[in-house]
Amino acid sequence: MPASFLFDGPDDARVTIMLAHGAGAPMDSASMNAAAKALAAEGFRIARFEFGYMAARRTGERRPPPKAETVMPEYVAAIDELGPTNGPLVIGGKSMGGRVASMIADSEFAAKRIAGLLCLGYPFHPLGRPEQLRTRHLIGMKTP
């Protein structure tokens, strides 16, 4: 479960966007900072969090990124921890974070816990293996 969030944007924003980091860079990396600041400048409230393996790196523990399926429950727990928002909640992330969000999006959308999905740099396949697509679950998605 995420220990803390980084927030950007107005507390009373009409839409909150929850973002998870990519496989190798934390929630406060240059690219995540830039994306959060740009979205906040448009009036969105941004809530960034880290998966457990990445948060552990802050205390010196180095673990490789787990499979996306492994951290799906952590994303759901982050939604729970964030709690009610002023308006609709959109989930997403950078690279692996966006992929994980996309993997839980339809169930969270069906449960009326989220209103949409935003992926920044979706990893369509593992590096150097374009034949191993990670897109099957995207076909027929119901989440906007």
Short names for language-model regions:
Residues 1-89:
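Serine-hydrolase catalytic machinery in alpha/beta-hydrolase-like enzymes
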Residues 75-143:
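Primarily recognizes the serine-hydrolase "nucleophile elbow" in alpha/beta-hydrolase
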